[in-house]
Amino acid sequence: KKLFIFVFITLICFGNFFYGKTTIEKNKKVKATFLDYNIKIVSPKISINRFFQNEEPEDTILDLIEISKPNKLENTIFIFPEGVLSNIYLQDIKNYKYIFSNHFSDKHKLILGLNSDENQKIFNSLVVLDNELNIISKYNKNKLVPFGEFLPYENLLSKFGLKKITQGYKSFSSDNKRKIINLNDISFLPLICYEIIYSGKLINNKKYFDFILNISEDGWFGDSAGPHQHFSHSIFRSIEEGKNLIRSTNNGISAFINSKGQIIK
């Protein structure tokens, strides 16, 4: 009986090893997409306290622009994290056009996380904007964090004074549509925050996008192993899906990861 258990465990270990090796070898054959764009990941360390303070966002916007160092002559996609402009809703972003248009050109595209308000529902959204802050595309988060983004049994528990952890009195709503965003000659699968942890459940058809994009606010983890664990999930997903992955975080680990799970930058 002991010999059987030993052999069984050994077969499982070797099976996992060879499956992983085969998957990595297969992913070596994935063709790279060569873009006419530079891609800049913007990875600030803006305090999580902003979620609980009614701060004017102009200084934060200027800080993000300074980190971005935009060159108006270069085709560039700037990728900002989730929620860095927590006091601005998508519907109000054009109020700050005068700042953005002074620093970005028509050669630039901006990707960032913003809250959006649609039909009296609030969504955690990833948006693609041009330098005039016109909306090119938008994705609403599918998988929400319980108690962080929504309060389960809200109608009942709110009567006892409970609410979600993040700012605002109202829970976020989830969208049930997984979306591929097409931007000129490239396409990507957008994932917001912990949507990256769902192994094997990102999307059914992997053929129709070039890479995975994950934006996140990791300041909620504080000084813990959380940001490193969250980052590890990104590596696992890139290997499983056989896709390059770009990750932009605030207070976390940002990186370019190739389809073999190797950190390129």
Model-assigned labels for residue ranges:
Residues 1-265:
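Enzyme catalytic cores with a strong preference for nitrogen-chemistry domains
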